[in-house]
């Protein structure tokens, strides 16, 4: 007796395939390819997941006891056109892939550029070595070729209501919420990378230890970059940068908004950071001091690298302020309320759901 298999992609597209119980998973993949197209759903690139397990090609469908009321997740591991695949540590510096996942900027328009001497002191050969990265890590900044690429990179992340929806979708594969949250955090909210982590193992500790990202990075710095020659060193002692780093470590859901802010307001600095990804990530992963409030950081974003009189502040309308006050009345600290409110694109209901689902502890 034929059964109906409901399938759902990570983009939340749902479709159904009729199968005979004795037919194998491989046959199901072939039917998916035939219906959806070889380019989008090649058999070789498909991974079918049910109840947290990858379905084996040679196993009959009936062996997995798939409930027709539930669904099988279809994940395609084929690389998208225009996006690079992380290169191995031995890759040549001249073949630089475009990162598949953007790394969050923590800076904005007011941030000063690094001292020009940091570039003038290098020979042309050194410059070509230090301004191209031989790897694309999960937390890399986007290639600085064009604003279009920055937008493409930002589109791979989820935030706000999309974050909560994606969290639920991945949990429906059979994973616990804690592990899904850890995988999303490790992948900087890239759902495809997060599922890969759940299947192959989350880098480092399953707990959100920020040092694991730093420890997982290969390879060593190029020989021409001696220790202490970090061109982004000028950021380290700036209080605004320190506060922004702390806020990002507290709430990774703010990463997409900050990425867009940097790309729009200070593309030159984004270019500089993209040339020195490893140093920037190491600085961002350094242990924070006292916790910072997003309300403080939002006003300081434009002042990094400049004098205090040039600080920019984010203004909120009276309606937005009332919404923030109502969220605070639910019992959450103001800093967390503001984080959630802006992360959910100023949608009060989504922010409330986000706060309640995260089970934040009062600071």
From Swiss-Prot:
Ranges where the record places region Disordered: 83-160, 201-227
Record's comment describing the protein's domains: The ubiquitin-like (UBL) and the UBA (ubiquitin-associated) domains interact intramolecularly in a highly dynamic manner, as each UBA domain competes for an overlapping UBL domain surface. Binding of ubiquitin or proteasome subunit Psmd4 disrupt the UBL-UBA domain interactions and drive Rad23a in to an open conformation.
Role: Multiubiquitin chain receptor involved in modulation of proteasomal degradation. Binds to 'Lys-48'-linked polyubiquitin chains in a length-dependent manner and with a lower affinity to 'Lys-63'-linked polyubiquitin chains. Proposed to be capable to bind simultaneously to the 26S proteasome and to polyubiquitinated substrates and to deliver ubiquitinated proteins to the proteasome. Involved in nucleotide excision repair and is thought to be functional equivalent for Rad23b in global genome nucleotide excision repair (GG-NER) by association with Xpc. In vitro, the XPC:RAD23A dimer has NER activity. Can stabilize Xpc. Reported differences to Rad23b in regard to NER activity and Xpc stabilization are probably due to differences in expression levels with Rad23a being much less expressed than Rad23b.
Pfam families found in the cross-reference section: UBA (PF00627), ubiquitin (PF00240), XPC-binding (PF09280)
Cross-link entry Glycyl lysine isopeptide (Lys-Gly) (interchain with G-Cter in ubiquitin), positions: 122
Assembly information from the UniProt record: Interacts with XPC; the interaction is suggesting the existence of a functional equivalent variant XPC complex. Interacts with PSMD4 and PSMC5. Interacts with ATXN3. Interacts with UBQLN2.
Family: Belongs to the RAD23 family.
Chief site of localization: nucleus
One Gene Ontology term of the molecular function aspect: damaged DNA binding
Originating species: Mus musculus
Alphabetized UniProt keyword annotations: DNA damage, DNA repair, Isopeptide bond, Nucleus, Phosphoprotein, Proteasome, Repeat, Ubl conjugation
GO cellular component: cytosol; Golgi apparatus; nucleoplasm; proteasome complex
Record PROSITE patterns: UBA (PS50030), UBIQUITIN_2 (PS50053)
UniProt record, GO biological process: DNA damage response; nucleotide-excision repair; positive regulation of cell cycle; positive regulation of proteasomal ubiquitin-dependent protein catabolic process; positive regulation of viral genome replication; proteasome-mediated ubiquitin-dependent protein catabolic process; protein destabilization
Name of this chain's protein: UV excision repair protein RAD23 homolog A
Subcellular location(s) of the protein: Nucleus
Domain UBA: 161-201, 318-358
Domain of life the protein comes from: Eukaryota
Modified residues (Phosphoserine): 123, 128, 133, 136, 138, 205, 295, 357
Taxonomy of the source species: Eukaryota, Metazoa, Chordata, Craniata, Vertebrata
Gene knockout outcome: No visible phenotype. Rad23a and Rad23b double knockout is embryonic lethal. Cells show reduced cell survival upopn UV radiation and reduced steady-state level of Xpc indicating a reduced NER capacity.
Domain Ubiquitin-like: 1-79
């Amino acid at each position: 007796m034929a059964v109906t298999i409901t399938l759902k992609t990570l983009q939340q597209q749902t479709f159904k395939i009729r199968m005979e119980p004795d037919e194998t998973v491989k046959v199901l993949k072939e039917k998916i390819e035939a219906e959806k197209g070889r380019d989008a759903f090649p058999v070789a690139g498909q991974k079918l997941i049910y109840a947290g397990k990858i379905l084996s090609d040679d196993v009959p469908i009936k062996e997995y006891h798939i409930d027709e009321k539930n669904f099988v997740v279809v994940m395609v591991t084929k690389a998208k056109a225009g996006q690079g695949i992380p290169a191995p540590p031995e890759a040549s510096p001249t073949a630089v892939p475009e990162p598949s996942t953007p790394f969050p900027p923590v800076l904005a328009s007011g941030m000063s550029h690094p001292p020009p001497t940091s570039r003038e002191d290098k020979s042309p050969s050194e410059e070509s070595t230090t301004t191209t990265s031989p790897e694309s890590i999960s937390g890399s900044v986007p290639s600085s070729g064009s604003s279009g690429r920055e937008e493409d990179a930002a589109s791979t992340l989820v935030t706000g209501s999309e974050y909560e929806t994606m969290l639920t979708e991945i949990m429906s594969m059979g994973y616990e919420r804690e592990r899904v949250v850890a995988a999303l955090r490790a992948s900087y909210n890239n759902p495809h990378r997060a599922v890969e982590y759940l299947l192959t193992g989350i880098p480092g500790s399953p707990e959100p230890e920020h040092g694991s990202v730093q420890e997982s990075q290969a390879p060593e710095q190029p020989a021409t970059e001696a220790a202490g020659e970090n061109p982004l060193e000028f950021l380290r002692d700036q209080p605004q940068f320190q506060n922004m780093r702390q806020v990002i470590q507290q709430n990774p859901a703010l990463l997409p908004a900050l990425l867009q802010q940097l790309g729009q307001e200070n593309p030159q600095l984004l270019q500089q950071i993209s040339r020195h990804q490893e140093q920037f990530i190491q600085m961002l992963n350094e242990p924070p001091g006292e916790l910072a409030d997003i309300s403080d950081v939002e006003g300081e974003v434009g002042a990094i690298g400049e004098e205090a009189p040039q600080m920019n502040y984010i203004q909120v309308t009276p309606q937005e302020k009332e919404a923030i006050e109502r969220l605070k009345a639910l019992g959450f600290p103001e800093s967390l309320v503001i984080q959630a409110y802006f992360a959910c694109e100023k949608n009060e209901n989504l922010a409330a759901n986000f706060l309640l689902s995260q089970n934040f502890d009062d600071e």
